[in-house]
A protein has these predicted regions:
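Short cysteine-rich loop/turn motifs with clustered Cys
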Residues: 1-46, 76
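Histidine-centered nuclease catalytic patch
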Residues: 30-75, 83-88
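Polybasic, low-complexity binding patches
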Residues: 59-70, 81-125
Length: 125
């Protein structure tokens, strides 16, 4: 099983379509590489590093996200582009914040929270 299959199965099991953390519908068979322009193709998804490999937040100097399955999540291509390498912000009308769950040396595993109707929830739970 390759990485994209592992990530999809970890979050969605055997489903062939799902909704990402920002409420965008994605389809298992529409995985795309991050470098492909897919802005006009509905339902495409890619793998996001929850805690980015190279965070754009100055408060986390010397910390980088890991490639562990626990630091990866499926996001629609557009959601992933909007989230970028930020640890908090807004995608569409959903506010998000990344929390550090585990750190081994300088490699970090993160988990994302989303704010819906004024309340914070762990994404995908």
């Amino acid at each position: 099983m390759n990485r994209k299959e592992k990530v999809w199965k970890y979050y969605f099991g055997d489903c062939t379509k799902a909704v990402d953390a920002f409420g965008v519908e994605i389809f298992k068979d529409r995985y795309v590489d991050e470098n492909i322009n897919t802005s006009k193709i509905s339902g495409c998804w890619t793998i996001d590093h929850i805690f980015p490999l190279n965070p754009s937040d100055d408060n986390v100097i010397n910390r980088k996200g890991s490639n562990s399955i626990y630091n990866l999540q499926p996001l629609s291509f557009i959601s992933n582009q909007k989230k970028g390498s930020r640890l908090n912000g807004k995608v569409g009308n959903i506010t998000y914040a990344v929390k550090i769950i585990e750190q081994i040396n300088n490699s970090v595993v993160g988990k994302m929270m989303v704010k819906v109707d004024g309340a914070w929830y762990w994404a995908y739970e």
